[in-house]
């Protein structure tokens, strides 16, 4: 008999390091890759893995995310086990916990244990909703069952110099976790590989009994400590549970020949920008064109993109770029850029290495370089952005450490 697996996506992230993109939306709702939202990649991982029972746990500035999922992720009403359902923070355990919203990743699941009980899940796959990657969750589940683990953690080898931002684990020869350290300044390295650490991707599969016991022991009656990385996983190890690591690099993706090595935490503006730029290379490591692993999202029924004008010096053209429906390149040039729906670049404009969200207009003779422009911004004719840091900062734009300029949503020049 096929096991009952419930997916839970943690989508309550505030994403403060992505401000101003998260000024009016949560991190999982931030647009990415021309037509997607960050949350779409986690949902697609479940759907493409044949797992159709998914709760999305939301909290911070969730309206944009709510509308996106309600528009784009509906199965209908005929199959009760096929659902993508939003679960906002609602103080469900008020009598026990008092006046408390979700206080951490583990607490978000703890406050919704009734959903797991009602579903009668055998296994619960708890995944982060704010990373860019492809993952065959079914394969991870198979390894979880095969090793008879109580908890399985998706693991990603990373340079030790970067690993302090993540949970880091040590494993034995069978990849059973022996130690776990959450965001420590000097992370331990992989034995024999002094420059690499084995980091947690924030994706877990729990056997239901172990999840119930660990959440009850870790959270019930506590006043601090409500996270999987800080509290639940260390508790599982100290209490003798079988915690297994799963090697993400061995995760098979149908239709993909190269190893599955692409995983990006787009938690900073620079990381977010570079992940978008990854998509426009000739042969990107993260391939969004694999028909055997389709990437679905909300349909906006936009018209096709269009390129107009071809006179000398006034040609509508784009190079090494991707753009969504409704975009019009009207006598301007776009290079190495990612354009959202209904973007319009006017004559003699030049857009280089930019990420333009939906409904952005770039005026005539404007020049943009390494700029993220949020939705509904009209850039006047003759405007330059990204060419003079001091000028950009004087206009109130965020300029990152690596020189990426961010124009906030609805900015008026």
From Swiss-Prot:
Domain of life per record: Bacteria
Pathway it works in: Glycan biosynthesis; glycogen biosynthesis
Entries under Pfam families matching the protein: Hexapep_GlmU, NTP_transferase
GO MF entry, a single one: glucose-1-phosphate adenylyltransferase activity
Matches recorded under SUPFAM superfamilies: Nucleotide-diphospho-sugar transferases, Trimeric LpxA-like enzymes
Catalysed reactions listed for this entry: alpha-D-glucose 1-phosphate + ATP + H(+) = ADP-alpha-D-glucose + diphosphate
Keywords from the named record: ATP-binding, Carbohydrate metabolism, Glycogen biosynthesis, Glycogen metabolism, Nucleotide-binding, Nucleotidyltransferase, Transferase
Nucleotide-binding keyword on record: yes
Similarity comment: family membership: Belongs to the bacterial/plant glucose-1-phosphate adenylyltransferase family.
Name of this protein: Glucose-1-phosphate adenylyltransferase
Taxonomic source organism: Deinococcus radiodurans (strain ATCC 13939 / DSM 20539 / JCM 16871 / CCUG 27074 / LMG 4051 / NBRC 15346 / NCIMB 9279 / VKM B-1422 / R1)
The encoding gene: glgC
């Amino acid at each position: 008999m096929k096991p009952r697996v419930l997916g839970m996506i943690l989508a309550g992230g505030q994403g403060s390091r992505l401000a101003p993109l998260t000024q009016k939306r949560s991190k999982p709702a931030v647009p990415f890759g021309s037509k997607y939202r960050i949350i779409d990649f986690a949902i697609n991982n479940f759907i493409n893995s044949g797992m159709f029972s998914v709760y999305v746990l939301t909290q911070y500035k969730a309206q944009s995310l709510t509308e996106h999922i309600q528009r784009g992720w509906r199965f209908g009403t005929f199959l009760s086990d096929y659902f993508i359902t939003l679960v906002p923070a609602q103080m469900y355990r008020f009598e026990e916990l008092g006046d408390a919203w979700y206080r951490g990743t583990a607490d978000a699941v703890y406050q919704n244990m009734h959903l797991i009980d009602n579903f009668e899940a055998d296994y619960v796959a708890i995944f982060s909703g704010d990373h860019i990657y492809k993952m065959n969750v079914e394969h991870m589940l198979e390894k979880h069952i095969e090793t008879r683990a109580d908890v399985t953690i998706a693991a990603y080898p990373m340079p030790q110099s970067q690993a302090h931002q993540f949970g880091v684990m040590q494993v034995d020869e069978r990849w059973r976790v022996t130690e776990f350290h959450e965001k420590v300044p000097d992370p331990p390295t992989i034995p024999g590989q002094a420059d690499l650490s084995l980091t947690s991707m924030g994706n877990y599969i729990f056997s239901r009994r172990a999840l119930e016991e660990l959440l009850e022991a870790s959270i019930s009656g506590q006043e601090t400590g409500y996270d999987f990385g800080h509290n639940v996983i260390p508790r599982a190890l100290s209490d003798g549970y079988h915690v297994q690591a799963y090697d993400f690099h061995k995760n098979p993706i149908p239709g993909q020949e190269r190893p599955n090595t692409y995983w990006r935490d787009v938690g900073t503006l620079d990381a977010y920008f570079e992940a978008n730029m990854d998509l426009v290379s000739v042969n990107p490591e993260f391939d969004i064109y694999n028909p055997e692993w389709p990437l679905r999202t909300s349909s906006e029924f936009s018209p096709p993109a269009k390129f107009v004008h071809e006179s000398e010096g006034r040609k509508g053209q784009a190079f090494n770029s991707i753009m969504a429906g409704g975009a019009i390149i009207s006598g301007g040039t776009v290079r190495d850029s990612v354009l959202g729906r209904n973007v319009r670049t006017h004559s003699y404009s030049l857009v280089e290495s930019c990420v333009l969200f939906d409904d952005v207009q770039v005026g005539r003779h404007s020049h943009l370089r390494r700029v993220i422009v949020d939705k509904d911004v009209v850039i006047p004719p003759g405007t330059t952005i990204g060419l003079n840091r001091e000028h950009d900062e004087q206009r109130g734009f965020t300029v990152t450490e690596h020189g990426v300029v961010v124009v906030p949503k609805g900015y008026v020049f």
